[in-house]
Amino acid sequence: MSKNRRLFTSESVTEGHPDKICDQISDSILDEILKKDPNARVACETSVTTGLVLVSGEITTSTYVDIPKTVRQTIKEIGYTRAKYGFDAETCAVLTSIDEQSADIAMGVDQALEAREGTMSDEEIEAIGAGDQGLMFGYACNETKELMPLPISLAHKLARRLSEVRKEDILPYLRPDGKTQVTVEYDENNKPVRIDAIVISTQHHPEITLEQIQRNIKEHVINPVVPEELIDEETKYFINPTGRFVIGGPQGDAGLTGRKIIVDTYGGYARHGGGAFSGKDATKVDRSAAYAARYVAKNIVAAELADSCEVQLAYAIGVAQPVSISINTFGSGKASEEKLIEVVRNNFDLRPAGIIKMLDLRRPIYKQTAAYGHFGRHDVDLPWERTDKAEQLRKEALGE
């Protein structure tokens, strides 16, 4: 590798990874509540370990959801259906500890500061202030057709394929837990030129040999997913590099909601504000504003106003308007960043109520995001992945 080239690595995990089990359970509960009560306030956390699921958090709703039933159904869909896996949908214990949302927080969210002080009408802001303070990032770049960085894009596709070959009985000896990792080499112009390394670790039946796993994973998982032109004789493969991965899932490691925030976003290629997504309704700006920031960044790149774009939004609890908007195009912008911020303010309502309305976030759409990434998805219709504002942004930014 020449001195002007660099390597960058991102990872993903399968739906059977312990932390991802928790994300999916939390978002399944959120979706079940939103089906019946779109205005519910939900902050749902899940923890799993051998034979045990604990669901806790703060939920304010007018409806009833059978949480243990939802938990078991989600675990069953993932594929933990036999006790010998160390975790089984039918026999695991499910404990719940749910409180209502704090009245102090609800006061700020129910009626935003601007409305309480009379500077904006309730109708205008739909009486929703930010559910917490914090900062959120969104990112897009033109490395892939989904406008995502190549390393995380490939890592997600490999993880999804790993689950597909298990569920479709192409490789029936695989079990639900698994991880993928892709290292991409970039040239001096910051363009991806080749794959330097691929790492795949997959849980498996104890009687399958390492040689068979390595051969099958390369044939049925890597080759159908990774573009042939990015592979060369120096590409390195690490398939189950420890030699054995039989004990996995919650039996191998305890899991928690919100512990895969880099997998959920951009694989470390862009910055992260620290807030997790799963189990949170859209009044939580950790989730909704991160989606809005991606929506903004993706439309800027789709409009060819920049090759890459990172958007930061920041909020104060109980205040509807973002306290700051920042845009970084890393020197690739066709318009100044000040101009881009002006155009963004004109075309995107970044108040929590505005985001919810703009992206229609009171729907049960969240479980499908809880594995294989919240961004760059073409297998599901996610409103923040649309590029419907690109043409208008370009027109305003460049005066076309």
From Swiss-Prot:
Protein's UniProt keywords contain Metal-binding: yes
Region (Flexible loop): 101-111
Annotated localization: Cytoplasm
Subunit and partners: Homotetramer; dimer of dimers.
Class in the EC hierarchy, top level: transferase
Protein's recorded name: S-adenosylmethionine synthase
Catalytic reaction annotation: L-methionine + ATP + H2O = S-adenosyl-L-methionine + phosphate + diphosphate
Native source organism of the sequence: Bacillus subtilis (strain 168)
Family matches, as PANTHER family: S-ADENOSYLMETHIONINE SYNTHETASE
Sequence positions that bind K(+): 45
Pathway per the UniProt entry: Amino-acid biosynthesis; S-adenosyl-L-methionine biosynthesis; S-adenosyl-L-methionine from L-methionine: step 1/1
Entry EC no(s): 2.5.1.6
Binding annotation for ATP: 17, 177-179, 244-245, 253, 259-260, 276, 280
GO terms for cellular component: cytosol
List of residues binding L-methionine: 58, 101, 253, 284
CC cofactor note: Binds 2 divalent ions per subunit. Binds 1 potassium ion per subunit.
Described function: Catalyzes the formation of S-adenosylmethionine (AdoMet) from methionine and ATP. The overall synthetic reaction is composed of two sequential steps, AdoMet formation and the subsequent tripolyphosphate hydrolysis which occurs prior to release of AdoMet from the enzyme.
One Pfam short name: S-AdoMet_synt_M
Binding residues for Mg(2+): 19
InterPro entries in the cross-refs: ADOMET_SYNTHASE_CS, S-AdoMet_synt_C, S-AdoMet_synt_central, S-AdoMet_synt_N, S-AdoMet_synthetase, S-AdoMet_synthetase_sfam
Disulfide bonds: none
Alphabetized GO MF terms: ATP binding; magnesium ion binding; methionine adenosyltransferase activity
